[in-house]
Amino acid sequence: IGIDLYWDKTYLKEQKEVFEKQLRWSIERNLPVAIHMRDAFDEVMDSIYNIGTGSLKGVFHSFTGTSEQLSEILKLRNFLIGVNGVVTFKNSNLGEVLKNVSVEKLLLETDAPYLSPVPHRGKRNEPTFIWKTAEKLSELYGLTVDYIVDATAANAKALFGI
């Protein structure tokens, strides 16, 4: 669920209405949400605060935002940050941004079939490539790949109740 303004803002009003309805449903049913947010940080956050953050929980899928945006998301407390192959890209500053957050707030994602990590960039993404994202986080945090994998798996299990 979420808001995507990458191509245009023609249906922003409708996107916000539907997004807020879906947020309400997630609260009513105590279900986590995976928030898709593309060129719509302010709009997504406005909707979240409009609905209320109390029992809302989830993941900000495919996060590529700024340090300031990350800080705002972390204030929500019940949300994880979804990290995929973008963190491995040569020109991405996502690694620097993520240094401001604990591994215990991260979730590994593939976004398959898109956003393959280096060295598979430009190819169809596959779940097996997630290891490259874990390796990059291992480098960034100075932790073992096993620790990154175990911590992010535990985060996912806790969020989704599995």
Question: Which positions does each model-derived feature cover?
Answer:
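Divalent metal-binding pocket/active-site signature
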Residues: 1-76, 88, 96-97, 101, ...
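Active-site micro-motifs of SAM-dependent methyltransferase domains
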Residues: 3, 114, 158
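Conserved catalytic/ligand-binding micro-motifs in nucleotide and anionic cofactor chemistry
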Residues: 92
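Conserved acetyl-CoA-binding loop of GNAT-fold acetyltransferases
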Residues: 78-80
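Active-site neighborhood of phospho(di)ester-bond hydrolases with catalytic His/Asp-centered motifs
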Residues: 34-35, 59-60, 82-84, 107-110
